[in-house]
Amino acid sequence: MSTEKVAFRMFLIPGCAAEYQRRHAAIWPELSALLRAAGVSDYSIYLDQEHHVLFATLRRSRAHGMDALPAHPVMRRWWAHMADIMRYGTDGTPIVEPLPCMFHMD
């Protein structure tokens, strides 16, 4: 199955890095299953500690189902669980900014 790589950034509230990492170390099995079912794999999140910016990369199948994730109850519950430690928009979802690929080497 063909995949594409996606990169984006999110924003952590200063002082919340340890809690962010703790919550992700205990990621809910139903959330992992939901992401996999949506075609997501090889998902990593990195922290720019100086600027409190989270940088994420993932692979997704070309026929991914990520567009349906924001409406899913498990995703909504996870976002509510993370709302106190990340910057969110007025719609109750984390601020996510796509990042264009500027260079790639196999």
Curated annotation (Swiss-Prot):
Domain of life (superkingdom): Bacteria
Any Pfam family: rhaM
Catalysed reaction equations from the record: alpha-L-rhamnose = beta-L-rhamnose
Pathway as given in its UniProt record: Carbohydrate metabolism; L-rhamnose metabolism
Active-site residues, as the UniProt record annotates them: 24
GO MF annotation, one: L-rhamnose mutarotase activity
Protein family: Belongs to the rhamnose mutarotase family.
UniProt organism field: Verminephrobacter eiseniae (strain EF01-2)
GO process annotations (BP): rhamnose catabolic process
Keyword list, A-Z: Carbohydrate metabolism, Cytoplasm, Isomerase, Rhamnose metabolism
Protein name: L-rhamnose mutarotase
Ranges that cross the membrane: none
Subcellular location: Cytoplasm
Name of the gene this protein is made from: rhaM
Gene Ontology CC annotations of this record: cytoplasm
Role, per record: Involved in the anomeric conversion of L-rhamnose.
Subunit architecture: Homodimer.
EC number of the protein: 5.1.3.32
Residues the record lists as binding substrate: 20, 43, 78-79
